Curated annotation (Swiss-Prot):
MF (Gene Ontology): antigen binding
UniProt subcellular location: Secreted; Cell membrane
Gene name in the database record: IGHV3-30
Species this chain originates from: Homo sapiens
Subunit field text: Immunoglobulins are composed of two identical heavy chains and two identical light chains; disulfide-linked.
Gene3D superfamilies per the UniProt record, alphabetical: Immunoglobulins (2.60.40.10)
Claim: Cytoplasm is one of the keywords in the record: no
Residue ranges, annotated region (Complementarity-determining-2): 70-77
Name listed for the protein in its UniProt record: Immunoglobulin heavy variable 3-30
Length: 117
């Protein structure tokens, strides 16, 4: 794919959910294609270690796209074909935190990223 601009920037916008169950995302930014970002999702209001957790995303003007899921104990992980081999989902149950390591980012990864239980 060719781009007319010298720089193509990628944006991972993050939104927190305000309710009894809280999932607060952080770590988005603007990067060049091919670079990396790590998103975090701090969970509270439920027993984090008992639930599988997902990342989903919504690109501008498009519907929700499932990205990845990790089992309650981190032993099983599954990915959408569009991110397989580039993104890695992980969790730290001692910190009630979910992560998404995003490598080799592409323009088409630009989206709002959400974590979900």
């Amino acid at each position: 794919m060719e781009f007319g601009l010298s720089w193509v920037f990628l944006v991972a916008l993050l939104r927190g959910v305000q309710c009894q169950v809280q999932l607060v995302e952080s770590g988005g930014g603007v990067v060049q294609p091919g670079r990396s970002l790590r998103l975090s999702c701090a969970a509270s209001g439920f027993t984090f270690s008992s639930y599988g957790m997902h990342w989903v995303r919504q690109a501008p003007g498009k519907g929700l796209e499932w990205v990845a899921v990790i089992s309650y104990d981190g032993s099983n992980k599954y990915y959408a074909d569009s991110v397989k081999g580039r993104f890695t989902i992980s969790r730290d149950n001692s910190k009630n935190t979910l992560y998404l390591q995003m490598n080799s980012l592409r323009a088409e990864d630009t989206a709002v990223y959400y974590c979900a239980k």
